Protein backbone atom coordinates (compact mmCIF):
# COMPACT_ATOMS: atom_id res chain seq x y z
CA UNK A 1 0.00 0.00 0.00
CA UNK A 2 1.44 3.40 -1.00
CA UNK A 3 2.00 6.28 1.38
CA UNK A 4 -0.44 8.38 -0.65
CA UNK A 5 -3.15 5.70 -0.26
CA UNK A 6 -2.61 5.64 3.48
CA UNK A 7 -2.75 9.46 3.62
CA UNK A 8 -5.94 9.55 1.57
CA UNK A 9 -7.59 6.97 3.81
CA UNK A 10 -6.63 8.75 7.00
CA UNK A 11 -7.53 12.14 5.58
CA UNK A 12 -10.92 10.92 4.40
CA UNK A 13 -11.73 9.70 7.90
CA UNK A 14 -10.67 13.06 9.31
CA UNK A 15 -12.84 14.93 6.82
CA UNK A 16 -15.87 12.77 7.54
CA UNK A 17 -15.34 13.20 11.25
CA UNK A 18 -15.17 16.96 10.79
CA UNK A 19 -18.14 17.16 8.47
CA UNK A 20 -20.46 14.51 9.85
CA UNK A 21 -22.63 12.72 7.28
CA UNK A 22 -22.84 13.82 3.66
CA UNK A 23 -26.58 14.28 3.40
CA UNK A 24 -28.18 17.46 2.14
CA UNK A 25 -28.74 18.50 5.76
CA UNK A 26 -24.99 18.91 6.20
CA UNK A 27 -23.62 21.74 4.04
CA UNK A 28 -19.97 20.71 4.51
CA UNK A 29 -20.08 18.22 1.64
CA UNK A 30 -22.67 18.49 -1.10
CA UNK A 31 -22.91 16.22 -4.13
CA UNK A 32 -24.30 17.33 -7.46
CA UNK A 33 -24.61 15.68 -10.85
CA UNK A 34 -24.94 17.78 -13.98
CA UNK A 35 -26.24 14.86 -16.05
CA UNK A 36 -27.05 11.18 -15.38
CA UNK A 37 -24.30 9.95 -17.69
CA UNK A 38 -21.58 12.14 -16.19
CA UNK A 39 -19.42 11.54 -13.13
CA UNK A 40 -20.64 13.00 -9.88
CA UNK A 41 -19.49 16.60 -9.31
CA UNK A 42 -18.68 17.42 -5.72
CA UNK A 43 -18.58 20.70 -3.87
CA UNK A 44 -16.70 20.50 -0.58
CA UNK A 45 -17.13 23.43 1.80
CA UNK A 46 -14.48 23.76 4.48
CA UNK A 47 -15.94 24.62 7.90
CA UNK A 48 -14.68 27.79 9.56
CA UNK A 49 -13.51 26.22 12.81
CA UNK A 50 -10.23 25.82 14.67
CA UNK A 51 -9.35 22.77 12.54
CA UNK A 52 -9.62 24.72 9.28
CA UNK A 53 -6.03 24.07 8.18
CA UNK A 54 -6.39 20.32 8.70
CA UNK A 55 -9.76 20.23 6.94
CA UNK A 56 -8.38 22.11 3.94
CA UNK A 57 -5.29 19.94 3.45
CA UNK A 58 -7.48 16.86 3.88
CA UNK A 59 -9.84 18.11 1.18
CA UNK A 60 -6.92 18.80 -1.15
CA UNK A 61 -5.43 15.34 -0.60
CA UNK A 62 -8.73 13.48 -0.99
CA UNK A 63 -10.07 15.58 -3.86
CA UNK A 64 -11.50 13.87 -6.91
CA UNK A 65 -11.20 15.25 -10.43
CA UNK A 66 -13.77 17.97 -10.96
CA UNK A 67 -14.18 18.89 -7.29
CA UNK A 68 -14.78 22.45 -6.12
CA UNK A 69 -13.41 23.22 -2.68
CA UNK A 70 -15.03 26.29 -1.15
CA UNK A 71 -13.39 28.39 1.54
CA UNK A 72 -15.46 30.57 3.90
CA UNK A 73 -14.87 34.16 4.85
CA UNK A 74 -12.41 34.66 7.68
CA UNK A 75 -8.73 34.63 8.61
CA UNK A 76 -7.17 31.19 9.04
CA UNK A 77 -3.66 30.35 10.27
CA UNK A 78 -1.29 27.69 8.97
CA UNK A 79 1.96 26.20 10.22
CA UNK A 80 2.53 24.02 7.14
CA UNK A 81 2.25 24.55 3.41
CA UNK A 82 -0.57 23.10 1.30
CA UNK A 83 -0.37 20.95 -1.82
CA UNK A 84 -2.66 19.80 -4.61
CA UNK A 85 -1.91 17.12 -7.22
CA UNK A 86 -5.39 16.28 -8.55
CA UNK A 87 -6.58 17.49 -11.97
CA UNK A 88 -9.61 19.71 -12.61
CA UNK A 89 -9.98 21.04 -9.07
CA UNK A 90 -11.24 24.53 -8.24
CA UNK A 91 -10.18 26.14 -4.97
CA UNK A 92 -12.49 29.09 -4.37
CA UNK A 93 -12.63 31.52 -1.49
CA UNK A 94 -15.19 34.18 -0.60
CA UNK A 95 -13.07 36.91 -2.22
CA UNK A 96 -9.76 38.73 -1.98
CA UNK A 97 -9.46 40.18 1.50
CA UNK A 98 -12.40 38.06 2.71
CA UNK A 99 -10.82 34.61 2.83
CA UNK A 100 -7.33 35.14 4.26
CA UNK A 101 -4.85 32.29 4.65
CA UNK A 102 -2.11 33.44 7.02
CA UNK A 103 1.24 31.66 7.04
CA UNK A 104 2.92 33.97 9.55
CA UNK A 105 3.53 30.94 11.77
CA UNK A 106 4.72 28.67 8.97
CA UNK A 107 7.45 26.21 9.91
CA UNK A 108 10.10 25.53 7.29
CA UNK A 109 10.79 27.49 4.13
CA UNK A 110 8.33 26.05 1.63
CA UNK A 111 5.65 27.69 -0.45
CA UNK A 112 2.18 28.36 0.90
CA UNK A 113 0.46 26.31 -1.82
CA UNK A 114 2.06 23.97 -4.37
CA UNK A 115 0.02 22.78 -7.37
CA UNK A 116 1.33 19.99 -9.62
CA UNK A 117 -1.83 19.05 -11.52
CA UNK A 118 -3.61 20.26 -14.65
CA UNK A 119 -6.80 22.27 -15.21
CA UNK A 120 -6.76 23.85 -11.76
CA UNK A 121 -8.49 27.13 -10.91
CA UNK A 122 -7.44 29.18 -7.88
CA UNK A 123 -9.72 32.10 -7.09
CA UNK A 124 -11.09 34.40 -4.43
CA UNK A 125 -8.65 34.32 -1.53
CA UNK A 126 -5.61 36.03 0.00
CA UNK A 127 -2.32 34.40 1.01
CA UNK A 128 -0.20 36.23 3.57
CA UNK A 129 3.34 35.96 4.90
CA UNK A 130 4.46 32.62 3.48
CA UNK A 131 7.98 31.56 4.42
CA UNK A 132 8.77 30.76 0.79
CA UNK A 133 6.86 31.44 -2.41
CA UNK A 134 3.20 32.31 -2.13
CA UNK A 135 1.60 29.99 -4.70
CA UNK A 136 3.77 27.81 -6.94
CA UNK A 137 2.52 25.61 -9.75
CA UNK A 138 4.87 23.29 -11.61
CA UNK A 139 3.98 21.29 -14.70
CA UNK A 140 0.41 22.50 -14.23
CA UNK A 141 -1.09 23.02 -17.68
CA UNK A 142 -4.20 25.15 -18.20
CA UNK A 143 -3.96 26.68 -14.74
CA UNK A 144 -5.94 29.78 -13.79
CA UNK A 145 -4.95 32.24 -11.07
CA UNK A 146 -7.85 34.66 -10.74
CA UNK A 147 -8.93 37.23 -8.13
CA UNK A 148 -6.13 36.41 -5.70
CA UNK A 149 -3.88 38.40 -3.39
CA UNK A 150 -0.46 37.28 -2.21
CA UNK A 151 1.31 39.63 0.16
CA UNK A 152 3.95 39.99 2.81
CA UNK A 153 2.50 42.34 5.37
CA UNK A 154 5.81 43.59 6.79
CA UNK A 155 6.66 45.52 3.63
CA UNK A 156 9.54 44.92 1.18
CA UNK A 157 12.13 42.79 3.00
CA UNK A 158 14.83 40.39 1.72
CA UNK A 159 13.47 37.75 4.11
CA UNK A 160 10.14 37.68 2.27
CA UNK A 161 9.35 34.80 -0.05
CA UNK A 162 10.83 35.05 -3.53
CA UNK A 163 7.70 34.81 -5.69
CA UNK A 164 4.07 35.67 -5.13
CA UNK A 165 2.45 33.78 -8.00
CA UNK A 166 4.91 31.33 -9.56
CA UNK A 167 3.80 29.09 -12.46
CA UNK A 168 6.66 27.21 -14.15
CA UNK A 169 7.07 24.54 -16.82
CA UNK A 170 3.47 24.88 -17.93
CA UNK A 171 1.34 25.54 -21.01
CA UNK A 172 -1.73 27.80 -21.13
CA UNK A 173 -1.16 29.90 -18.02
CA UNK A 174 -3.77 32.53 -17.12
CA UNK A 175 -3.09 35.11 -14.41
CA UNK A 176 -6.06 37.45 -14.11
CA UNK A 177 -6.85 40.16 -11.53
CA UNK A 178 -4.12 39.12 -9.11
CA UNK A 179 -2.47 41.42 -6.55
CA UNK A 180 1.03 40.78 -5.18
CA UNK A 181 2.96 42.85 -2.66
CA UNK A 182 6.39 42.41 -1.14
CA UNK A 183 7.98 39.53 -3.10
CA UNK A 184 11.77 39.54 -2.78
CA UNK A 185 12.19 38.36 -6.38
CA UNK A 186 9.07 38.75 -8.55
CA UNK A 187 5.44 39.38 -7.71
CA UNK A 188 4.07 37.53 -10.73
CA UNK A 189 6.65 35.23 -12.30
CA UNK A 190 6.03 32.90 -15.23
CA UNK A 191 9.01 30.76 -16.19
CA UNK A 192 9.82 28.08 -18.78
CA UNK A 193 6.25 28.11 -20.01
CA UNK A 194 4.26 28.58 -23.21
CA UNK A 195 1.08 30.45 -24.08
CA UNK A 196 0.69 32.88 -21.22
CA UNK A 197 -1.66 35.73 -20.32
CA UNK A 198 -1.01 38.09 -17.39
CA UNK A 199 -3.65 40.79 -17.21
CA UNK A 200 -5.62 43.22 -15.04
CA UNK A 201 -3.30 42.65 -12.09
CA UNK A 202 -1.67 44.92 -9.52
CA UNK A 203 1.94 44.41 -8.47
CA UNK A 204 3.55 46.75 -5.99
CA UNK A 205 6.52 46.83 -3.61
CA UNK A 206 8.13 43.76 -5.17
CA UNK A 207 11.64 43.61 -6.62
CA UNK A 208 10.22 42.72 -10.03
CA UNK A 209 6.55 43.42 -10.49
CA UNK A 210 5.93 40.99 -13.37
CA UNK A 211 8.60 38.73 -14.84
CA UNK A 212 8.35 36.54 -17.93
CA UNK A 213 11.44 34.33 -18.04
CA UNK A 214 12.57 31.69 -20.56
CA UNK A 215 9.05 31.48 -21.94
CA UNK A 216 7.47 31.47 -25.38
CA UNK A 217 4.33 33.41 -26.23
CA UNK A 218 3.10 35.82 -23.54
CA UNK A 219 0.65 38.70 -23.45
CA UNK A 220 1.15 41.07 -20.50
CA UNK A 221 -1.55 43.72 -20.62
CA UNK A 222 -3.79 46.05 -18.64
CA UNK A 223 -1.77 45.65 -15.46
CA UNK A 224 -0.55 48.23 -12.96
CA UNK A 225 3.08 47.89 -11.88
CA UNK A 226 3.83 50.55 -9.28
CA UNK A 227 6.45 51.05 -6.56
CA UNK A 228 8.49 47.99 -7.47
CA UNK A 229 12.23 48.00 -8.14
CA UNK A 230 11.45 47.12 -11.76
CA UNK A 231 7.97 47.12 -13.25
CA UNK A 232 7.96 44.44 -15.97
CA UNK A 233 10.92 42.19 -16.84
CA UNK A 234 11.31 39.87 -19.84
CA UNK A 235 14.41 37.75 -19.33
CA UNK A 236 16.08 34.74 -20.91
CA UNK A 237 18.80 32.92 -18.96
CA UNK A 238 21.18 30.07 -19.81
CA UNK A 239 21.31 26.54 -18.41
CA UNK A 240 17.57 26.06 -18.00
CA UNK A 241 15.49 23.32 -19.67
CA UNK A 242 13.77 25.87 -21.90
CA UNK A 243 16.15 28.42 -23.43
CA UNK A 244 15.30 30.90 -26.16
CA UNK A 245 12.44 32.92 -24.72
CA UNK A 246 10.57 34.89 -27.37
CA UNK A 247 7.32 36.45 -28.54
CA UNK A 248 6.12 38.55 -25.64
CA UNK A 249 3.76 41.51 -26.00
CA UNK A 250 3.70 44.14 -23.23
CA UNK A 251 0.84 46.53 -23.86
CA UNK A 252 -1.71 48.85 -22.24
CA UNK A 253 -0.03 48.66 -18.84
CA UNK A 254 0.46 51.41 -16.27
CA UNK A 255 4.11 51.24 -15.19
CA UNK A 256 4.84 54.07 -12.80
CA UNK A 257 6.96 55.07 -9.81
CA UNK A 258 8.97 51.86 -9.75
CA UNK A 259 11.61 53.30 -7.44
CA UNK A 260 11.71 50.92 -4.48
CA UNK A 261 15.27 50.06 -3.48
CA UNK A 262 16.33 46.62 -4.66
CA UNK A 263 15.86 44.26 -1.71
CA UNK A 264 16.57 40.95 -3.46
CA UNK A 265 18.98 38.64 -1.64
CA UNK A 266 22.50 38.80 -3.17
CA UNK A 267 23.10 36.31 -5.97
CA UNK A 268 19.62 36.48 -7.48
CA UNK A 269 19.54 37.69 -11.09
CA UNK A 270 17.01 40.37 -10.13
CA UNK A 271 19.46 41.73 -7.58
CA UNK A 272 21.15 43.39 -10.58
CA UNK A 273 18.01 45.26 -11.67
CA UNK A 274 18.45 48.99 -11.04
CA UNK A 275 15.82 50.59 -8.87
CA UNK A 276 13.77 52.85 -11.10
CA UNK A 277 13.42 50.47 -14.07
CA UNK A 278 10.11 50.57 -15.89
CA UNK A 279 10.42 47.74 -18.43
CA UNK A 280 13.59 45.68 -18.81
CA UNK A 281 14.28 43.22 -21.63
CA UNK A 282 17.31 40.99 -21.12
CA UNK A 283 18.52 38.53 -23.77
CA UNK A 284 15.02 37.93 -25.13
CA UNK A 285 13.69 38.02 -28.68
CA UNK A 286 10.64 39.38 -30.49
CA UNK A 287 9.37 41.53 -27.64
CA UNK A 288 6.79 44.19 -28.51
CA UNK A 289 6.24 47.11 -26.12
CA UNK A 290 3.35 49.41 -27.00
CA UNK A 291 0.49 51.44 -25.61
CA UNK A 292 1.92 51.60 -22.09
CA UNK A 293 1.91 54.52 -19.68
CA UNK A 294 5.43 54.94 -18.26
CA UNK A 295 5.95 57.61 -15.63
CA UNK A 296 8.46 58.61 -12.97
CA UNK A 297 10.72 55.56 -13.14
CA UNK A 298 13.89 57.17 -11.84
CA UNK A 299 16.50 55.19 -13.82
CA UNK A 300 14.84 54.68 -17.21
CA UNK A 301 11.46 53.75 -18.58
CA UNK A 302 12.73 51.03 -20.95
CA UNK A 303 16.03 49.17 -20.62
CA UNK A 304 17.39 46.75 -23.22
CA UNK A 305 20.30 44.68 -21.98
CA UNK A 306 22.51 41.68 -22.62
CA UNK A 307 23.29 38.91 -20.16
CA UNK A 308 26.65 39.77 -18.62
CA UNK A 309 28.06 36.59 -17.12
CA UNK A 310 30.18 33.96 -18.85
CA UNK A 311 28.16 30.90 -19.90
CA UNK A 312 28.70 27.55 -21.62
CA UNK A 313 25.16 26.80 -22.84
CA UNK A 314 25.53 26.53 -26.63
CA UNK A 315 21.78 27.05 -27.12
CA UNK A 316 21.88 30.49 -25.55
CA UNK A 317 21.94 33.93 -27.14
CA UNK A 318 22.60 36.61 -24.50
CA UNK A 319 21.49 39.61 -26.58
CA UNK A 320 18.15 41.41 -26.68
CA UNK A 321 17.03 41.33 -30.32
CA UNK A 322 14.06 42.05 -32.57
CA UNK A 323 12.52 44.31 -29.95
CA UNK A 324 9.86 46.83 -30.99
CA UNK A 325 9.10 49.92 -28.88
CA UNK A 326 6.24 52.08 -30.16
CA UNK A 327 3.27 54.23 -29.20
CA UNK A 328 3.94 54.46 -25.48
CA UNK A 329 3.53 57.58 -23.32
CA UNK A 330 6.41 58.78 -21.16
CA UNK A 331 6.64 61.34 -18.39
CA UNK A 332 9.23 62.16 -15.74
CA UNK A 333 11.83 59.60 -14.80
CA UNK A 334 15.51 59.16 -15.62
CA UNK A 335 16.44 61.86 -13.12
CA UNK A 336 18.07 59.65 -10.47
CA UNK A 337 19.69 56.64 -12.18
CA UNK A 338 20.63 53.76 -9.91
CA UNK A 339 23.06 50.86 -9.98
CA UNK A 340 25.62 50.64 -12.78
CA UNK A 341 23.69 53.18 -14.83
CA UNK A 342 24.42 55.88 -12.28
CA UNK A 343 27.97 55.94 -13.66
CA UNK A 344 26.68 56.96 -17.09
CA UNK A 345 24.37 59.71 -15.87
CA UNK A 346 27.01 62.49 -15.80
CA UNK A 347 27.61 61.98 -19.53
CA UNK A 348 24.00 63.02 -20.10
CA UNK A 349 23.89 65.84 -17.59
CA UNK A 350 22.58 63.58 -14.83
CA UNK A 351 19.43 62.66 -16.74
CA UNK A 352 19.04 59.42 -18.67
CA UNK A 353 16.62 59.34 -21.60
CA UNK A 354 13.42 57.31 -21.63
CA UNK A 355 14.90 54.37 -23.58
CA UNK A 356 18.35 52.97 -22.79
CA UNK A 357 20.14 50.15 -24.60
CA UNK A 358 23.45 48.89 -23.26
CA UNK A 359 24.79 48.67 -26.82
CA UNK A 360 26.14 45.13 -26.49
CA UNK A 361 26.38 43.49 -29.93
CA UNK A 362 28.71 40.52 -29.32
CA UNK A 363 29.73 38.10 -26.60
CA UNK A 364 32.66 35.91 -25.62
CA UNK A 365 34.72 36.91 -28.63
CA UNK A 366 32.02 36.41 -31.26
CA UNK A 367 31.59 38.83 -34.14
CA UNK A 368 29.19 41.74 -33.73
CA UNK A 369 25.64 41.08 -34.92
CA UNK A 370 22.71 43.26 -35.97
CA UNK A 371 20.06 43.03 -33.27
CA UNK A 372 17.29 44.79 -35.22
CA UNK A 373 16.00 47.02 -32.45
CA UNK A 374 12.99 49.03 -33.61
CA UNK A 375 12.70 52.32 -31.70
CA UNK A 376 9.53 53.66 -33.31
CA UNK A 377 8.73 56.48 -30.90
CA UNK A 378 8.48 60.17 -31.74
CA UNK A 379 11.77 62.01 -32.07
CA UNK A 380 10.96 63.87 -28.86
CA UNK A 381 11.31 60.63 -26.86
CA UNK A 382 14.91 60.29 -25.72
CA UNK A 383 17.02 57.27 -26.60
CA UNK A 384 20.62 56.28 -26.02
CA UNK A 385 22.89 53.36 -26.75
CA UNK A 386 25.61 53.22 -24.13
CA UNK A 387 27.90 51.66 -26.71
CA UNK A 388 29.27 48.97 -24.41
CA UNK A 389 29.95 46.64 -27.32
CA UNK A 390 30.79 43.56 -25.27
CA UNK A 391 30.98 42.54 -21.61
CA UNK A 392 33.01 42.95 -19.49
CA UNK A 393 32.89 46.71 -19.97
CA UNK A 394 36.02 48.40 -21.28
CA UNK A 395 35.66 52.09 -20.45
CA UNK A 396 38.21 52.97 -23.13
CA UNK A 397 35.99 51.62 -25.90
CA UNK A 398 32.61 52.98 -24.80
CA UNK A 399 30.82 54.76 -27.62
CA UNK A 400 27.51 56.25 -26.43
CA UNK A 401 25.18 57.51 -29.14
CA UNK A 402 21.67 58.88 -29.34
CA UNK A 403 21.30 57.85 -32.96
CA UNK A 404 18.62 55.24 -33.26
CA UNK A 405 19.64 51.99 -34.94
CA UNK A 406 18.41 51.19 -38.40
CA UNK A 407 16.00 48.30 -38.27
CA UNK A 408 13.60 46.24 -40.33
CA UNK A 409 9.95 45.78 -39.32
CA UNK A 410 9.26 42.88 -36.96
CA UNK A 411 5.97 41.03 -37.26
CA UNK A 412 3.96 41.27 -34.06
CA UNK A 413 3.08 37.93 -32.49
CA UNK A 414 -0.57 36.90 -32.69
CA UNK A 415 -2.68 37.51 -29.58
CA UNK A 416 -2.47 34.70 -27.07
CA UNK A 417 -5.60 32.55 -26.93
CA UNK A 418 -6.24 30.23 -24.01
CA UNK A 419 -9.18 27.87 -24.40
CA UNK A 420 -10.14 27.86 -20.72
CA UNK A 421 -10.21 31.68 -20.57
CA UNK A 422 -13.88 32.44 -20.00
CA UNK A 423 -13.76 36.18 -19.41
CA UNK A 424 -11.33 37.67 -21.97
Stretches found by the model and what they are:
Residues 264-412:
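Extracellular beta-rich repeat passengers
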Residues 56-62, 77-86, 91, 102, ...:
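Short, T/G/N/S-enriched strand-turn elements that build extracellular solenoid repeat scaffolds
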Residues 94-97, 118-129, 141-154, 171-184, ...:
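Right-handed parallel beta-helix
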Residues 16-18:
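C-terminal motif of bacterial Sec signal peptides marking the signal peptidase cleavage site
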Residues 43-70:
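Acidic Gly/Asp/Thr-rich repetitive segments characteristic of extracellular carbohydrate-active
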Residues 53-57, 79, 103-113, 129-136, ...:
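Extracellular beta-strand/beta-solenoid scaffold signature
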Residues 20-23:
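Bacterial signal peptide processing site
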Residues 45-54, 88-132, 154:
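Right-handed parallel beta-helix/beta-spiral solenoid domain characteristic of secreted/periplasmic
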Amino acid sequence: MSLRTIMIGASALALLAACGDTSSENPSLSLESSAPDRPQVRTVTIPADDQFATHLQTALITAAEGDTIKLPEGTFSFTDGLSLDVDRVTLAGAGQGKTILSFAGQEGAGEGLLVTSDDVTLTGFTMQDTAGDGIKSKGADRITYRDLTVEWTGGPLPTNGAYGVYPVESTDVLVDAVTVRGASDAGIYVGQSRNIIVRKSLVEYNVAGIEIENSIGADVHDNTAENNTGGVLVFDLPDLPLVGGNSTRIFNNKIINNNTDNFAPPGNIVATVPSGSGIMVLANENVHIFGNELANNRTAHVLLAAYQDVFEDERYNPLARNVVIRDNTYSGGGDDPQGALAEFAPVFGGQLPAIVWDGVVSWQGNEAVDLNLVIAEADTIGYVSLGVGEYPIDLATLAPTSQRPEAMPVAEPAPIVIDHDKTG
